[in-house]
Amino acid sequence: MDPYNTVTTITSFDDSNIENGCIWLIPGSHLWGQQELGFRVTQKWKNELNEIDLSVNESDAIPIPLKAGESIIFHCLVLHKSNPNRTKKYRRYLFLRYADADAVEVYNHRKPRLGKLLNGTTSYQEVNDFEKELF
């Protein structure tokens, strides 16, 4: 994201550990600046199990096991990963990213993705009318 003042939150719905692929972080890696991926991220790429080679020392990474209901918050430039879940147990996370309204995705060729992020329903007609004017 640019500007680079975005934070990510991860809330664990299940206990996570090294065996089921908990998140790993490299402390201090946000000080290295934006890391170039060197390729375009496509939907096909996202659907496959992939690795990104960033020429970093992975031994600097630390696991962050979480109990169900626990959360972590980290800067968007902190390098992070998770390994495959090698157990039969779930490892469900809720990822939320908080950014400036004018921030754009660096990995999307600096093109903002536009659209509703969340939309509920209401029985109040005045709310429906107002939303029609917005969207």
Residue ranges and their predicted role:
Residues D2-Y4, Q35-R40, E51-L54, Y93-L94, ...:
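Short, surface-exposed, polar/charged, turn-prone segments marking secondary-structure boundaries
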Residues S71-I73, L77-F135:
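Non-heme Fe(II)/2-oxoglutarate
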Residues M1-I18, P65-A68, I73, R97-D102:
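Short, conserved beta-strand element in jelly-roll/cupin
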Residues S16-L79:
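Double-stranded beta-helix
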Residues T6-T9, F13-D14, T42-I52, A61-I62, ...:
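Low-complexity, flexible helical/coil segments
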